[in-house]
Regions:
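Short S/T/G/P-rich N-terminal loop/turn motif that feeds into the first structured element of a domain
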Residues: 1-57, 64-74, 88-136
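A short, acidic, amphipathic alpha-helical segment used as a generic capping/interface helix at domain edges
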Residues: 77-83
Length: 136
């Protein structure tokens, strides 16, 4: 499978400022609704609460392909979420699991460096598979 056309997982760990959890849940809900309506390449988009830390949350996202991630980053409601995130959260850290094309990694390095978003890329080894039925 061409790296540009491979599905992958993105995990974003968010730490919300004390006293801002309800506000953050509101912007997360707004972003989630917009993503569901405008991003067919986002196969799964969840915002989960840490069971041990009321200020810690995790976005779990599954993308159909590289183009879907680029569309997500460029989606105006997601960009608006990013601006509000800066006001309401202490941090965000991103991890990507799967295979991305080099040009996508270059795009992420530029886009997220400007925003100060740290990310770590876990490239797929030769072990693993994706069921074709998920992409049909």
């Amino acid at each position: 499978m061409n790296p540009k056309n491979s599905p992958f997982v993105l995990i974003a760990r968010v730490r919300v400022r004390p006293g801002k959890v309800d506000d953050y849940l509101n912007i997360a809900a707004e972003a989630d609704s917009a993503v569901q309506q405008t991003e067919p390449g986002m196969l799964m988009h969840n915002f989960d609460a840490d069971p041990d830390d009321p200020l810690q949350f995790t976005w779990t996202e599954i993308y159909r392909d590289d183009e879907s991630l680029i569309a997500h980053i460029n989606n105006p409601p997601v960009q608006e979420y990013g601006k509000k995130h800066l006001e309401l959260a202490e941090s965000i850290e991103v991890e990507i699991y799967g295979t991305l094309a080099d040009e996508t990694l270059n795009f992420l390095n530029m886009a997220w460096a400007e925003s100060g978003i740290p990310f770590k890329y876990f490239k797929t080894t030769s072990v693993g598979y994706v069921r074709d039925s998920l992409l049909s």
